[in-house]
Amino acid sequence: MAYERFGIILQSEQYDEDIGNTKVNQKMNEGNHYDLHRKNAFDRIIHSESKKGDNVINYNIHENDKIKAADNIFSSKLKMNPNMSYEMNINCFKNIGYGENQETSKVLTNSLSNNDINTEESGVVDKNSPFLTLGTTILNSNGKSRRWEQKLVHIKTMEGEFSVTMWASGISDDEYSGSDQIVGASDLLKGKEEFGIDGFTSQQNKEYQKMESKFTNAQTLEMPHPISSVQIMDHLIKERGNLSQENNISERILSKTTLSFEEPILLPDSSSIELVNETAAMTINNHRTLSNHTGNTGDLHALPSSVPFRIGLHEGQVNDCLSTISQSTHQDNTDSTGCGEMNLSEVTVSYTNDKKIACPHKGCNKHFRDSSAMRKHLHTHGPRVHVCAECGKAFVESSKLKRHQLVHTGEKPFQCTFEGCGKRFSLDFNLRTHVRIHTGDRPFVCPFDACNKKFAQSTNLKSHILTHAKAKRNTSISGKSGCSNAESNSQSEDTSANYVKVELQDSVTENHVPFVVYAD
C-alpha cells in the first residue's frame, strides 16, 4: 500500500499498524530511519548504473561518500504531552561543506535523471523501495510524476537563527491536487510540523513579551514634578524684598537717631568733614557752633552707617579767643571774654546710649558698652611677659610675639598668588595691602570737597590730607589776634587751622585699632 509520509511517497505493509498505534508519548527516531533508507536508495542507484560501465559506478561511489560527508543531519523528536500539545526539540543542525558539494550534487542529479529515463522506458520500478532520493522521478498514486529537490530553510528561534536543508517536492499545485492521499497521516504530520515550529515560536514570543512588559514596569522610575521657573523667581523676589525691608528699617533708625553733645564743639564755617572707609562713612555739614548748653542746634546729615564714632578737635598752635564756648550750663555767650589756649582733644560726639563702662587702667580713657568687652580690652594692659630675644620688645600675647619674630628671621610665609608676581610678605596685613595693587581697589577717599583722590593705604590718605592743611595755612590771612565779641571769634575761626580727628571705636577695626583721619 502506497502512502505519503514527510512529503515522500512510501510503500509499506506495516503502515496500518503504525496508524493504529497512536500513543501519547510516541518517539520517532527519524535520523536513523533517514540514514537507513538513504543508504538503500543510493545502493539501488549505484546498482542501476552498473550497466553503463565501471567508470560511472566508481564516480557515483566517490560522489556518494562526499554527499554523506556534507549531509545536513536534521533530527527532531516529536512529543505529545498530556494536553495533546506537541513540542519540537531540535537536537542539532549541522551544515558541513554545503557550498563545496553543491556542484557535486548537480552532477549526481544529472546522472540520476538519465537513470530515471532509462528506468521509465524499461518500465521497471521497484515498488518495494521504501525511500526514493535526490533527483529521482517517481509516480504517485495517480500515476503523476513528482520530483524532489533540496532547499535551504532559515529558522529563527529565541536562542538564535539556523539554516536547515530540507527536501521539498517539485510538483505543482494543480498536479498535486488530483492525487489521492492518506488524509489522516498527512494532516497529522502537517499539524505537528506547524505546531512544532510556528506554534513553538509564537508561544516563546508571547512569553518573551510578558517578561519584557514585567521588566519594563519594574524599571519604571517615578520622576518628581518639575520645578517651575516662576516659583523660583517668586522665591528670589520674596527673599530680596525681605532684605530690602531690613535695610529700610536700619536706615530709618539711623535717620531718626538724635545725637546729644556733652561739650560744645566749634567747627569752622568752611569745614566739610567726610570719612570714607570700608565699613563706615560720615559727613558733617554744619557751619555753626554746636552746643546743647547754649541753645544752639546741631545737625548731622547723611549718616549711612551705624558704626560708632568719635570726633575730636586738635588745636595746633592757635591762640584764638573762643568766647562762644562756655563750660557752665547757665552762662550766656556774650558773658565769656578773654583769650587763652584750649585743648579740645577729649571732646566727643556720642549716641544717647553710648558706652558707659570706662577702662579702669590709668591713662586709658576708653569706654565700653558691657563689662565683657571691657575685660577683653583690659587684657591689653596686662603684663608683657612675652619678650623678644633679639630686640627686647615685650608683648602681652604670644601670638603677637611670634608675628614680631618674623621680622628678625626674615621668614615670609604669605605669598602673592597673582600670575607673574610671587612677592612674599611676613604679615598677612601687608599681603592684603599689596593685593590692592593688582585689583585696583582704593577704599580710602579724600574727604575734602573737589578732591576725589583715592588711596589703597590709610597712611597715604593721611599724608595727602596734610597737604590740604599746609595749603590752607599758606593762603590764610594771619595776624589777627585778640577778640572781644562773637564776630571777632568767627573771623579768627576762618583764619585758624584746626585739625579734626575722626576715629572709629574699637569694635570697628579687626585689631581694635581706631582709624584716624585728620582734616582741616
Curated annotation (Swiss-Prot):
InterPro entries: Znf_C2H2_sf (IPR036236), Znf_C2H2_type (IPR013087). Keywords: Developmental protein, DNA damage, DNA recombination, DNA repair, DNA-binding, Metal-binding, Nucleus, Repeat, Repressor, Transcription, Transcription regulation, Zinc, Zinc-finger. It comes from the Eukaryota. SUPFAM superfamilies: beta-beta-alpha zinc fingers. This is Polycomb protein PHO. It is found in: Nucleus. Its main location: nucleus. Polycomb group (PcG) protein that binds to the 5'-CNGCCATNNNNG-3' sequence found in the regulatory regions of many genes. PcG proteins act by forming multiprotein complexes, which are required to maintain the transcriptionally repressive state of homeotic genes throughout development. PcG proteins are not required to initiate repression, but to maintain it during later stages of development. They probably act via the methylation of histones, rendering chromatin heritably changed in its expressibility. Probably targets the Esc/E(z) complex to DNA. Coiled coil: none annotated. A zinc finger (C2H2-type) spans 357-381, 386-408, 414-438, 444-468. Residues 475-497 are annotated as: Disordered. Component of the Esc/E(z) complex, composed of Esc, E(z), Su(z)12, HDAC1/Rpd3 and Caf1-55. This complex is distinct from the PRC1 complex, which contains many other PcG proteins like Pc, Ph, Psc, Su(z)2. The two complexes however cooperate and interact together during the first 3 hours of development to establish PcG silencing. Component of the chromatin remodeling Ino80 complex. Interacts with Sfmbt to form a pho-repressive complex (PhoRC).
